[in-house]
Amino acid sequence: MNDLPPIANLISNILFVLLIITFLYALCSRFVSDKTLYDYTILPTNDPEKINYYIEPSPSPKEKIPFPTVFSPSEVYTTFVVPAYNESKRITPMLDETVAYLERRASENPEFTWEIIVVNDGSKDNTAEIVTNYAFKHPQIRLLNQPKNMGKGAAVQAGCLHSRGELILMVDADGATKIDEFEELEKKIKSLTTINKEAIVVGSRAHLEGAEKANRTPLRKFLGLGFHMLITIAGVHGIKDTQCGFKLFTREAARWLFPNQHVQRWCFDPELLVIAQSRQMEVAEVPVEWNEIGDSKMKISGMIKMAIDLVQIAIYFRAGLWTVKDKADTPISDFEV
């Protein structure tokens, strides 16, 4: 006798179909590349797909200056990485709020140094032009241009791989999370680093629904139940909200996470957490105030692709098709940092 309610049955059937589809996809994939964006940006290579990132606007008008990498010693206290795709309408107010906050913190403490890296993910509007003009007024802002639209995951990955900060915050360009929530994540990560320098703090909306602090639509709440089941299948445990675009990494954690990240679009967050938990990093959730922005980029088709990606993460890591590089194979030992 089936005691499950109709909705639970529907979710179970969808998950089962996705599992079969992804398994067949993995089975039929004769070659699954273990290369990541890191292999095309940091490692020396003659591959024609090699990507070179230069700071924009250039600090030197006569030459292009390459972005530093996360494997160099930190130069500032914190880096805010902002992935941006067609954000011409929202990037200015977001930068206004963020710069005001960071300047206030810096005025209170001279050791609070910062940078913002806006990663333009192949925008078709004038996002890059807006950020460039903003950066002329605020030299702590750097524009990193992707050669084409590669996905939010790739944008975050590129920004974090080229950060100078001791702490690296991933933050969405839509302003859904108030920027001063950074302080809550900052406090938590400092407590975690007394145990392990490799640490992540995840901004979370899941803890706040009872307190009505998170204003989420019923549709997203329903879809969240199904995704939570898939996230568990993918191998993420103990994290209730993997998808909030507000996460803080130590530099030491970033050096392991982003060279090993394969997923380049919406579903990269769970993969980072799978990598972190395989490395036994310290991972914690902190409630943040969050408001859903009406002009959401996530469409139904994107949600389906994300669900397939989650099952793909589970299969590829378990089958050894994707791996977390051992220390001897990573740039950490090569750079001797």
From Swiss-Prot:
Q: In which pathway does it act?
A: Protein modification; protein glycosylation
Report the InterPro entries cross-referenced here. DPG_synthase (IPR035518), Glyco_trans_2-like (IPR001173), Nucleotide-diphossugar_trans (IPR029044)
Q: Which family does it belong to?
A: Belongs to the glycosyltransferase 2 family.
What keywords would UniProt list here? Endoplasmic reticulum, Glycosyltransferase, Membrane, Signal-anchor, Transferase, Transmembrane, Transmembrane helix
Which protein, by its recorded name, is this? Answer: Dolichyl-phosphate beta-glucosyltransferase ALG5C
Source superkingdom: Eukaryota
The EC designation for this entry is 2.4.1.117
- Its gene is ALG5C
- At the top of the EC hierarchy, this enzyme's class is transferase
**Has UniProt tagged this entry with the keyword Transmembrane?**
yes
Catalytic activity from the UniProt record:
a di-trans,poly-cis-dolichyl phosphate + UDP-alpha-D-glucose = a di-trans,poly-cis-dolichyl beta-D-glucosyl phosphate + UDP
Q: Where in the cell is it found?
A: Endoplasmic reticulum membrane
| GO BP annotations, alphabetical order | protein N-linked glycosylation
A single GO molecular function, which one?
dolichyl-phosphate beta-glucosyltransferase activity
Regions annotated as coiled coil: none
One GO CC term of this entry?
A: endoplasmic reticulum membrane
Is Transmembrane tagged as a keyword?
yes
Q: Which organism is it from?
A: Trichomonas vaginalis (strain ATCC PRA-98 / G3)
**Cytoplasmic side of membrane:** 28-337
Q: Which residues lie on this side of the membrane: Lumenal?
A: 1-6
Could you tell me what this protein does? Dolichyl-phosphate beta-glucosyltransferase involved in the glycosylation of glycoproteins through the synthesis of dolichyl beta-D-glucosyl phosphate which serves as a sugar donor for transfer of three glucose residues to the Man-9-GlcNAc-2-PP-dolichol precursor to N-glycans.
Where, by residue number, does the polypeptide cross the bilayer? 7-27
How does the protein's chain sit in the membrane according to the entry?
Single-pass membrane protein
Q: Which PANTHER family match?
A: DOLICHYL-PHOSPHATE BETA-GLUCOSYLTRANSFERASE, GLYCOSYL TRANSFERASE
